[in-house]
Each structure stands twice: as C-alpha cells, then as structure tokens.
Regions:
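Flexible, glycine-rich loop/tail regions that form catalytic "lids" or insertion modules at the edges
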Residues: 1-44, 51-55, 59-62, 113-114, ...
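Active-site-adjacent structural elements in folded domains
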Residues: 47-51, 70-74, 86, 102
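Glycine-rich phosphate-binding loop at the start of an alpha helix
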Residues: 49, 80, 111
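Glycine-rich, proline-tolerant flexible connector loops at the mouths of alpha/beta enzymes
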Residues: 65-81, 348
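Generic structural signal for helix capping and beta-alpha/helix-loop junctions
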Residues: 72, 111, 134-135, 349
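Alpha-helix-loop-beta-strand connector modules within alpha/beta enzyme cores
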Residues: 75-101, 153-160, 164
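A compositional/structural signature marking long, glycine- and acidic/polar-rich segments
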Residues: 87-89, 98, 132-149
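Glycine-rich beta-to-alpha transition loops that act as phosphate-gripper elements at the mouths
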Residues: 100-111
Length: 361
C-alpha cells in the first residue's frame, strides 16, 4: 500500500508543518523564493520552475516553497505567482501528480488569499507572517489567551472561510477545489496569466511582469527605508491618503446630505463626485459610445416601455433595512420598472400600495 500523509486542514500549524517536512518516508525539497535583484522577476520564475521540475524528476514528492523577508540586494517572488507557475509547469509536463506543493507564505493572510493559493495549485499553506503577527500581539497582551490558543482560533476562522468559499462553488472537499482555478483575474496581463494562471479569464488585461518587477523593487526600497511610522495602507478601513475606497467619507456624507435635504442640487454634487472619481470598480470603465447619426426618437420604443424591462436585484428584508427595502420598491414602481422582495417576501401591509414589490422570491 502507498504511504499517505493526512492533515485535517490545508492550513498548517507549525507542528503539522514540521511533521510533514521531517517525515522519513517522503523526500522533501525546499526552495527559497528569494532571488538576486540583478535578475528580473520573470527570469527568477523561470529558474524556479526548472529547479522544481528537476527535483520532482529525482523523486522529491514534497516541494516546499518558502516566501520570507529577503536580505539586502535580494527580492522575493510572491507565493501566489510561484505556486501558480510551478503548478502550471508540472501540469504541462505530466508531473503534477508526482508531487505536492506546500508553501510557507508571508503574503497570504486572509481566507481569499489562502483560497487563491489552493485554487491555483497549493496542497497546503503555512501562513507564517499571520502566525508571527499573532505571536507578537499575544506576547504584548493585545490579544486575550496564549499564542497557541490564538493561532488555533485563527486557523479555525480561516477553515470556516475556506468552507464558505468552496461551498458557494458547489464543492465539498478541498481536494476538488485544489487547482480548480475558479477565479476571474482583474488587472493582470497575458504574459502573467499564461505563465502563472494558464486559461484563467482576465477580461480587461492589465499589468505585465515588468510592471510587477518595478513595484516589487519599489516596495523593497520602501520596506528598508528608515521611516518613523509604518503606513497601514487603509485596505480594510478608510485612511486619508491611503487605499482609495469607493464609499469614502466625502461621498457618503454628500449622499446623506442629498437624501435628508431632498435637494436636487446637492444630489447633482454627489453624482459629480461619483462620476469624476478614478476607476474603482469595473463599471467605472463603462463608456457609452456616441454614434454619428442618431436614430430618430420616433423610431424607437418610448421610455415607459423600455423601463418595464428593468428590475432591481432581489434582496431580502434583513439584508436591507425596512426603510431601504420599501424605498427601492416605491422607486421602481414610480419608474414603471420591477422590484423584487427577495427571500421571505414582505409585510402584507405593503400589498397593493406604492411600497409593494412586484416580484416575489
């Protein structure tokens, strides 16, 4: 019978990682994702792929990709790029079933990032920077409980998040999700997609390897600079001068002002803020083409008939507040379009009134 290693989760603890790497029955080959800054990111990936293929052909069944802080004059390949490139190379050569890809990742911290690693080929993930952060916070008493307990809670949360992600795709086991590539890429060019995420949809294209190389070097320079404060960035919470948020305080405040005052002039100011912002969503890139010879307005359907084909998405009471739920229904009724009550329907007091949703789910 074949010898097998069984783990209860693709997110490894330190003990599980060491047990896996030091198992006498499996040959392990470790690859540091650090490369000399004199070569390009794309060249470093090509070297990594060749070395991994050679190791697998020599019988190494566990490939350990390690992403950690590099020394000066060195850079590190992002673990997702590395996992994707290695996975695709092994698949193309018919070697993927001969090896498992385990990654010690500093860049993967939340459920989406870890799901991406697994979805693009990783067998298991050890999120080292997340654990180091939890250890530091526990030692400074900023988190209740011991470091061991907090790391266990973190893994439990990640596992729940992964189960939620895969279940939404109709998948019940992590082995079925591994390498499935059930993603759409936003903002990466064909050269990166072809090498690291082959056949994954990337509709609007975007950055090339050269762009990522420049960003990587800039980030390395910033990380080594003697700054008094670390830039938090504002990815999760809005910070002035940080990551742009579509619903930032200026826009939200103006919308609230327009709603409370009922002033069309204030609403126009809100609309102008939204329309003139830098692209933050795919819909911001949508532009209506102007034709040279407009169609005679009498030759097309009237607005009232066209509006009948519009509907608002079904959203249940609870997901929306009662006021918002009723306002949507009332607005769509006034337009002559269709609203949708969402799951659970609506209060019978709204029946046969302007606040009644036309569609019932």
């Amino acid at each position: 019978h074949a010898r097998r290693l069984v783990t209860t989760s693709p997110v490894l603890s330190y003990t599980k990682l060491q047990s896996l790497l030091n198992n006498p029955y499996f040959k392990v080959k470790e690859f540091d994702l650090v490369f000399d800054s004199d070569i390009s990111l794309e060249a470093a990936l090509d070297i990594l792929k060749a070395e991994v293929v050679s190791a697998v052909k020599k019988g190494n069944s566990i490939i350990h990709l390690v992403e950690e802080m590099p020394d000066e004059n060195y850079l590190s390949i992002n673990s997702l790029l590395a996992v994707g490139a290695v996975h695709q190379e092994l698949v193309s050569l018919g070697l993927r079933s001969d090896a498992n890809i385990v990654t010690t990742s500093s860049s993967a911290r939340d459920t989406h990032q870890i799901a991406c690693l697994i979805g693009f080929g990783a067998t298991a993930v050890y999120p080292t920077l997340a654990y180091q952060t939890i250890l530091d916070l526990s030692m400074r008493k900023e988190l209740k409980g011991s470091a061991h307990e907090n790391c266990a809670r973190y893994r439990k949360g990640i596992n729940k998040g992964l189960l939620k992600i895969i279940s939404k795709m109709g998948i019940s086991t992590i082995s079925s999700y591994r390498g499935s590539q059930l993603f759409e890429i936003v903002g990466l060019g064909d050269d990166i997609v072809q090498k690291c995420f082959t056949n994954t949809t990337s509709r609007i294209k975007g950055k090339s390897f050269q762009d990522l190389d420049v960003e990587l070097r800039s980030l390395d320079e910033y990380a080594r600079s003697n700054l008094a404060d670390i830039n938090v960035g504002g990815l999760l919470k809005y910070i002035h001068g940080g990551e742009y948020h579509a619903y930032n305080p200026e826009i939200v405040k103006k919308l609230q002002e327009a709603v409370s005052s009922g002033s069309e002039a204030v609403y126009r100011q809100y609309a102008e803020l939204v329309d003139n912002r830098a692209p933050a969503m795919l819909r911001d890139l949508l532009v209506l083409k102007k034709i040279q010879h407009p169609q005679d307005i009498k030759a097309v359907e009237p607005v009232k008939k066209i509006l009948k084909r519009f509907d608002s998405a079904g959203m249940s009471l609870g997901a929306l507040s009662p006021k918002a739920h009723e306002t949507l229904a009332e607005a769509m009724n006034h337009l002559g379009a269709r609203s949708n009550s969402g799951e659970g329907g609506e209060d019978q007091e709204r029946f046969y009134k302007d606040r009644m949703a036309i569609g019932k789910t």
